[in-house]
């Protein structure tokens, strides 16, 4: 059976068709229209083109930058604001004349890595996307765990665990609350922290624009950059230990731009053990297998094998 996954992003809509074995059969990307009707049309056109090209019909799953309320059936919390308040799965289902499954894009990432990615075979997978923001999702036995409110995995909008005095009221998150995990361990948060330290030290140097800029300085032994990365690692460990203490997943998979920082992985185990209850932690924390394609593949796998 052919499975089609759609990643409905703020700037692009991408469709991937997968075989039963997970082999990619078709891929196409288009610019996201800035209105709801245009978005529906773009998704339907991509599905029809894939089916015409491959000569067969398939299932459709859609990953969105928001969630579907299990009570109203309406999309909420999406940064693509024109889909908020809409029964997206119902409307697409009517247009495509089949059931369409819709899930949060971070949950799709977790499903992708659980089904045939870096955590294949693990029963409970916590998938983390650390880039401009910080999202997460939970997959149990290869299926999305959305939870009773449809917000399972919204870990980035909890307060940073075990905050120091200096960390309290550092930054207000876009969600309206102060000191969210996202404001500290996203790539944006890492850059903000380093640049603040640079200013405080009175060092005459161009501000960093990305985590990669800082890691180049870390490799050179720059003291300010090394200290910023040390703080980042401790905050990441606290944040993930909080998940382990509550959920105790079989594997944690990192995605997003910060997941490409190789220095994270050898340092995490000892730091995690310091914060996990019992001071012992054997949870594997691994880099994703499918990179930026993982979310759209996970949308396809919303229709399980």
Question: Which ranges hold each PLM region?
Answer:
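Active-site nucleophile and cofactor-binding loops and adjacent substrate-binding regions
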Residues: 80-81, 101-107, 127-130, 286-293
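A charged helix-plus-loop insertion that forms the helical arch/lid used to bind
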Residues: 73-85
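Glycine-rich phosphate-binding loop of actin/hexokinase-like ATP-binding domains
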Residues: 122-184
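Short beta-strand segments
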Residues: 7, 61-65, 103, 126-133, ...
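Residue-level detector of high-confidence beta-strand sites
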Residues: 27-29, 78, 147
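ATP-binding/phosphotransfer module of carbohydrate and carboxylate kinases, centering on a glycine-rich
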Residues: 1-59, 69-72, 90-100, 115-122, ...
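Conserved PLP phosphate-binding loop immediately N-terminal to the Schiff-base lysine helix
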Residues: 103-117
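Hydrophobic "anchor" residues
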Residues: 23-24, 75, 144-145
């Amino acid at each position: 059976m052919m499975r089609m996954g759609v990643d409905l992003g703020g700037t692009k809509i991408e469709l991937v068709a997968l075989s039963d074995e997970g082999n990619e059969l078709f891929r196409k990307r288009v610019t996201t229209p800035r209105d709801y009707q245009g978005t529906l049309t773009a998704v339907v056109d991509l599905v029809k083109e894939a089916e015409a090209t491959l000569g067969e019909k398939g299932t459709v799953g859609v990953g969105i930058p928001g969630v579907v309320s299990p009570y109203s059936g309406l999309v909420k919390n999406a940064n693509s604001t024109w889909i908020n308040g809409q029964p997206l799965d119902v409307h697409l289902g009517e247009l495509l004349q089949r059931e369409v499954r819709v899930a949060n894009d971070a949950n799709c990432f977790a499903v992708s890595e659980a089904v045939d990615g870096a955590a294949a075979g693990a029963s409970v997978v916590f998938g983390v996307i650390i880039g401009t923001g910080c999202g997460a999702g939970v997959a149990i036995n290869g299926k999305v765990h959305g939870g009773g409110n449809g917000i399972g995995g919204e870990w980035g909008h909890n307060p940073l665990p075990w905050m120091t005095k200096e960390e309290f009221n550092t930054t207000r998150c876009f969600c309206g609350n102060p000191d969210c995990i996202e404001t500290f361990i996203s790539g944006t948060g890492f850059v903000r922290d380093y640049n603040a330290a640079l200013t405080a030290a009175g060092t005459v140097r161009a501000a960093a624009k990305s985590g990669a800029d800082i890691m180049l300085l870390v490799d050179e032994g720059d003291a300010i950059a090394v200290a910023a990365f040390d703080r980042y690692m401790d905050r990441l460990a606290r944040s993930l230990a909080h998940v382990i203490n509550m959920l105790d997943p079989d594997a944690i998979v990192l995605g997003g731009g910060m997941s490409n920082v190789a220095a994270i992985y050898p340092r995490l185990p000892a730091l995690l053990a310091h914060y996990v209850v019992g001071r012992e932690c054997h949870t594997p924390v691994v880099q994703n297998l499918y990179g930026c394609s993982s979310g759209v593949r996970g949308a396809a796998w919303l229709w399980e094998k």
